[in-house]
Design a protein with these regions (language model features):
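Terminal alpha-helical segments
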Residues: 1-289
Length: 289
């Protein structure tokens, strides 16, 4: 699977946008299968569905059509590997695009009437409350987003600190960190905490990694960017394969920039995140929490 993913990746990079989605999807699918096989004792993944479908006969405008995230297949197995939801769900294409941090600025400019979902954060650190022997994650909200409107929609997972010099939030949930306990026990608690909390943070790969949290507002799709990207890539690949005329119309219309950015940035981001999940390491110049 890994070798196939690499071959499709190298091929997709050289293709024009009109045909790129088809090959890029097969790269993403094989990359996902690499992770699934690793996490599930070399699962051969024989005769398995893609885990995504859509109604190609829908009369809805193209980006208002729904993608069905199935409860089985490659998509569900990928979701299970990263502790994401595996429930069957129908979501509009536009809503899925809106929930991708890697293209959130492009989406906000393209669809200016929709509320921006992502808040940039910095200075993300683990903090220790020594008297209580409890640790947690803390971060600073970007100054441009430290106003009342943005702060009002921060998820209840986080709470504001009493710091007066900057707008600092922390994760409400704590974990035990007692220096008198064995290091192995402490690390085990940290890893367990990390696995539960990490999905509340989002990153964009780059020379300087950018970090975000997602607002708690209408339109939020509580699925991992990996799952969302996989589903969208499958949908676009089917559009290219079965209805190239409609895909051509999409590229020549209002959403041209958004689709091009998705195919460029989110494709690269997907591979980066999969590699991070497989290795447990920071890959390239992007990194994952």
């Amino acid at each position: 699977f890994r070798k196939q993913a690499m071959n499709f990746y190298n091929a997709a990079k050289e293709l024009p946008i009109e045909s790129k989605p088809l090959i890029a999807y097969y790269c993403c699918m094989n990359a996902a299968k690499s992770l699934i096989s690793l996490k599930n004792d070399n699962d051969p993944l024989i005769n398995i569905s893609h885990g995504v479908s859509s109604d190609r006969n829908s009369n809805q405008s193209i980006l208002n059509k729904e993608i069905i995230l199935e409860g089985g297949g490659v998509l569900a197995k990928l979701a299970n590997c990263i502790k994401d939801s595996t429930n069957k769900e129908r979501v509009k294409v536009l809503d899925l695009l809106r929930n991708l941090p890697a293209i959130h600025r492009t989406f906000s400019i393209t669809c200016s009437k929709k509320t921006e979902l992502f808040i940039p954060i910095e200075n993300i650190v683990f903090k220790l409350n020594k008297p209580h022997k409890k640790a947690y994650i803390q971060f600073t909200i970007d100054d441009a987003y430290s106003n009342g409107n943005a702060l009002r929609n921060i998820p209840k997972t986080f709470e504001k600190t009493k710091d007066t010099e900057a707008v600092i939030f922390r994760v409400k949930k704590r974990f035990d960190w007692d220096i008198h306990r064995k290091e192995s026990e402490r690390i085990q608690k940290l890893v367990k905490y990390h696995n539960k909390i990490r999905h509340n943070f989002f990153y964009i790969r780059g020379f300087q990694t950018s970090w975000y949290i997602k607002k708690n507002v209408k339109g939020v799709v509580n699925r991992s960017p990996l799952v969302i990207t996989y589903a969208l890539m499958h949908w676009l690949s089917e559009l290219v394969r079965y209805n190239p005329q409609e895909f051509s119309q999409l590229l020549s219309g209002h959403y041209n920039w958004l689709i091009n950015e998705f195919m460029d940035i989110c494709f690269q981001q997907f591979i980066d995140e999969i590699c991070c999940e497989i290795t447990g390491e920071n890959i390239g110049y992007g990194k994952s929490i």
